[in-house]
Every structure is written in C-alpha cells, then in structure tokens.
Amino acid sequence: MTEWEHVNKVWAVVEPDIPAVGLAILLRLFKEHKETKDLFPKFKEIPVQQLGNNEDLRKHGVTVLRALGNILKQKGKHSTNVKELADTHINKHKIPPKNFVLITNIAVKVLTEMYPSDMTGPMQESFSKVFTVICSDLETLYKEANFQG
C-alpha cells in the first residue's frame, strides 16, 4: 500500500465524524498557536474557551476537512484541488503558507488522540509524509504567486 492508500484507509473512518474532528483541530490550532486565531476575523475576538460550541467554527472545520479529504482522495494527483485551495488562501484570505504546516501537524495529533487504534506510529508517519507533500505543493504555488504575507 502507498502512503496515500494508508491515509485514505483511516480517512474513511474519520469522515463520518468530520464536524467533531474539524472543530477539535481548529480549537487545538488556536490553543497551541494563538496567533492563528487572528487570521480568522469572525473568531478573532472570541476567547478560545467560548469557541467549543460555536456553530460557525464547527462549519468552518467541516469546510477545512472536506477540502482536505478531497485532496487526500486524489492520492497525489491533487494539483487542481491544491491550486483552488492556494488561490483562495492567497487572494481572498491572505493566509501565509506556514499555517498549512501548523494545521496539518495539529491534525496528526488530534487524529491520533481521537482514533488511537487506527493512527498507529506507521500511520502517523504516512499522514505526516502526505501532509508534507501537500504543504510543499502549496508553498510552490505561493512562491509562483509572489505571495507577500
């Protein structure tokens, strides 16, 4: 099995829980990297402790994980999906590319905590490798766009 196939095997288990997983990932991101919350105008002024029941944050978590799932399902042939993600984050949201590394690192932690029997050591490595490829592809697109952020 390739890294992509390993990741997709676990992703099939995660998908039914996307609302809870997405919320957990964003909350952890905001707790461990407080500066990232400032990138979200809608949540910027709300204390992290009050975001656990925030419907807008839950919906955004769903959006994030659906986009990620669509990329993962392409098994490395994701250039169109990654380009769309880069375009919105470069031109609309103005999100620096380092934040993709932060959120994917958090995702591995959260998935490991929520799905310990699926997220074995080798599976964590597979996710890390796949996320590194995705983040690298995003960074390339940012450089091509001369992103200044």
Swiss-Prot record:
Any one GO CC term of the record: extracellular exosome
Catalytic activity reported: Fe(III)-heme b-[protein] + nitric oxide + H2O = Fe(II)-heme b-[protein] + nitrite + 2 H(+); H2O2 + AH2 = A + 2 H2O
Binding site for heme b: 89
Location(s), subcellular: Cytoplasm, Sarcoplasm
InterPro entries xrefs: Globin (IPR000971), Globin-like_sf (IPR009050), Myoglobin (IPR002335)
Uppermost EC category: oxidoreductase
EC number: 1.7.-.-, 1.11.1.-
Positions annotated to bind nitrite: 60
Modified residues (N-acetylthreonine): 2
Matches recorded under CDD domains: Mb
MF annotations from Gene Ontology: heme binding; metal ion binding; nitrite reductase activity; oxygen binding; oxygen carrier activity; peroxidase activity
Alphabetical UniProt keywords: Acetylation, Cytoplasm, Heme, Iron, Metal-binding, Muscle protein, Oxidoreductase, Oxygen transport, Transport
Chief location: cytoplasm
GO biological process: removal of superoxide radicals
Signal peptide: none
Residues that, per the record, bind O2: 60
Annotated ranges, domain Globin: 2-143
Keyword Transmembrane annotated: no
Superkingdom per UniProt: Eukaryota
Function: Monomeric heme protein which primary function is to store oxygen and facilitate its diffusion within muscle tissues. Reversibly binds oxygen through a pentacoordinated heme iron and enables its timely and efficient release as needed during periods of heightened demand. Depending on the oxidative conditions of tissues and cells, and in addition to its ability to bind oxygen, it also has a nitrite reductase activity whereby it regulates the production of bioactive nitric oxide.
Homology family: Belongs to the globin family.
Subunit structure: Monomeric.
Protein name: Myoglobin
Source organism: Heterodontus portusjacksoni (Port Jackson shark)
